[in-house]
């Protein structure tokens, strides 16, 4: 047990170092710049150098802070992030020094709900850190983070309900075992879309990084933190990203099962190969995080709340109802439940994706667009020889005309 815990800790720390480096490299590539390239060959040691730099920095404690809560907040954020990984299955039963053991630290009948609860506990560190800093900007960042977790934790939990219905269990290992033939992403596509959006909001990442919006809150909840305390907040953020990515892999992408066509090989799901498939799937979701950060602007607070409460939560409730009805047909022996579920899943997911545009346009802007279209239709058509919009004179011509008028006067 202790060896597994140590292996998970080392796995997470190494992946955090690689994730920070790759994020900066990928952002540089997408923004047409080289990215970090100074420390080590091609900049591969940049993350390690940054970690050492943060460890050696001076610890500055602002005056007037609640010191106990101020120092405890990073720890409260970090511990649940690491603990949640104890319930993630990396692979099947393997032989380690002659001892047969599953590649999972532990499991529970309600493991997914336990992970959901741990992810919610992590927000306490953010809220307490913002409150204990004794500053306005961190406090606002903490309050935003609380509202964000409350809004998107509901949608995320509802996206799990359909998975529980078809897996027949809340255990992560049992859910992975239920996907040995068909991954749930093909049967429950709307649940995956809702979870994908919710996991980005849950981890406070772009375009949902409102608790640490630089243009509004300086650095958000960790404005007053430095040195190792800031590093712990950063570590918790990246470990949480890996936790929700691993959970998406376990719930929707077959966990450690090999993807097609590799699953045609007889030994693809035996030995240590499943660890490779699991890690590759997890890194696919991490790449989506980096891609979203490079592509999308930050949402306004009202847009973000509207997306969660007006779209994701109602859509989750409707989809759970549809999935439950189809599951009832399956239990009653209806033979064609699979094509009905797949077609319903595709249609509902397409409607959900098309509906994502509505929360990002406010009602008065939509009304203004309709009004402008009506007025444009009422305008008389101009002849082809005359431009619709008059071309203003160049600055040089305007100055010359003004000087002539002055000379005449």
UniProtKB/Swiss-Prot annotation:
| Topology term for the membrane | Multi-pass membrane protein
Q: Where is the signal peptide?
A: none
What EC number(s) is this enzyme filed under?
Answer: 7.1.1.-
Localization recorded for this chain is: Cell membrane
Q: Which domain of life is it from?
A: Bacteria
Q: Which PROSITE patterns match?
A: COMPLEX1_ND1_1, COMPLEX1_ND1_2
Q: Enzyme class, one word?
A: translocase
Q: Which Pfam families match?
A: NADHdh
Name-wise, this protein is: NADH-quinone oxidoreductase subunit H
Q: Which organism is it from?
A: Mycolicibacterium paratuberculosis (strain ATCC BAA-968 / K-10) (Mycobacterium paratuberculosis)
């Amino acid at each position: 047990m202790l060896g597994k815990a140590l292996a998970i800790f080392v796995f997470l720390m190494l992946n955090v170092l690689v994730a920070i480096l790759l994020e900066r490299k990928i952002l540089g590539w997408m923004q047409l710049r080289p990215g970090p390239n100074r420390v080590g060959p091609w900049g591969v040691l940049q993350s390690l150098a940054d970690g050492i730099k943060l460890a050696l920095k001076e610890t500055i404690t602002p005056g007037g802070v609640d010191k106990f809560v101020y120092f405890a907040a990073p720890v409260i954020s970090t511990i649940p992030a690491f603990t949640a990984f104890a319930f993630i299955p990396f692979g099947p039963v393997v032989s380690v020094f002659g001892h047969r053991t599953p590649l999972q630290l532990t499991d529970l009948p309600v493991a997914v709900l336990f992970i959901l609860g741990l992810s919610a506990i992590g927000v306490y560190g953010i809220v307490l850190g913002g409150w204990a800093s004794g500053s306005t900007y961190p406090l606002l960042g903490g309050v935003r983070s609380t509202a964000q977790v409350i809004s998107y934790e509901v949608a995320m939990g509802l996206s799990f309900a359909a998975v529980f219905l078809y897996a027949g269990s809340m255990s992560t290992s049992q859910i992975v075992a239920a996907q040995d033939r068909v991954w749930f992403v093909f049967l429950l596509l709307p649940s995956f879309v809702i979870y994908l959006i919710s996991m980005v909001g849950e981890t406070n990442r772009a375009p949902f990084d409102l608790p640490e919006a630089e243009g509004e809150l300086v650095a958000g909840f960790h404005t007053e933190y430095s040195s190792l305390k800031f590093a712990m907040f950063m570590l918790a953020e990246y470990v949480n990203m890996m936790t929700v990515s691993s959970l998406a892999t376990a719930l929707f992408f077959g966990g450690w099962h090999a993807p097609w066509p590799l699953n045609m090989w007889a030994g693809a799901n035996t030995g240590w190969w499943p660890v490779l498939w699991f890690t590759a799937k997890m890194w696919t979701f991490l790449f989506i995080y980096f891609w979203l950060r490079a592509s999308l602007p930050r949402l306004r607070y009202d847009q973000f709340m509207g997306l969660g409460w007006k779209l994701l939560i109602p859509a989750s409730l409707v989809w759970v109802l549809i999935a439950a009805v189809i599951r009832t047909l399956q239990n009653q022996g209806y033979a064609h439940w699979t094509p009905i579920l797949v077609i319903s899943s595709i249609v509902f997911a397409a409607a959900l994706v098309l509906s994502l545009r509505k929360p990002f346009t406010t009602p008065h802007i939509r009304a203004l667009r309709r009004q402008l279209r009506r007025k444009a239709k009422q305008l008389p058509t101009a002849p082809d020889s005359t431009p619709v919009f008059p071309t203003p004179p160049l600055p040089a011509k305007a100055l010359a005309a003004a000087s002539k008028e002055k000379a005449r006067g």
